[in-house]
Curated annotation (Swiss-Prot):
GO terms for biological process: regulation of DNA-templated transcription. It comes from Bacillus subtilis (strain 168). The lineage of its organism: Bacteria, Bacillati, Bacillota, Bacilli, Bacillales. Its main location: cytoplasm. The keyword Transmembrane does not apply. This is Uncharacterized transcriptional regulatory protein YvcP. CDD domains: REC_OmpR_NsrR-like, trans_reg_C.
Amino acid sequence: MYRILLVEDDERIASLLGGHLQKYGYEVKIAEQLNDIKLEFAEMKPDLVLLDINLPFFDGFYWCRQIRTISNAPIIFISARTDELNQVMAIENGGDDYITKPFHLEVVMAKIKSVLRRTYGEYSPSLPQESRIVELGGLTIYPDQNEAEWNSVRILFSQKEFQLLSIFVREHKKIVSRDELLEALWDDVDFVDDNTLTVNVNRLRRKLENAGLTDCISTIRGQGYQFQVNRKDEAEC
């Protein structure tokens, strides 16, 4: 049974959504300590978090960043903020998906199922099965930790970032279309804003660059992305 932490300060919405989730067989905990969501998360160790943005004390973006310091569990934002900027901020702060209020319960359930499948189920990204540690041109990848290492620098990725990296590694030097990535990461292209993919690719690119791995993700105009690691020396790819 998957465990879901529901962080919502509107008691009516929390009760309605929590009850619906339980009918689908999920174990649900509605956060009570809204001043310490990180503690709530650590105590429950949920498989997924549903997180509102407008919260007392600190907003959902803050708590998403706090959770990301201890876990890569998928986080779906649910918010009345419908503008594109907030959706981009949700992804940039570590979120995996975004649902706007008012919402249809069946859409919420479909998104949850999709994220859980891709994170834990049959659609979760797989790197070569012959080894749980993969090396590519000096880049070492640790699938079990959602981490990689370059020049002795460890890089921690969010779930979506690591899914992207997994696909890029599998398709090394090949051009991967945006539609392929959208479908692989979010199951249904129609439900995802195209900017969401751009944000995740940019976050992955930035983390690799911060570790010293530069110019490895190329944007191929009108086609998609190409990932290539060619180790030349200890400083560049």
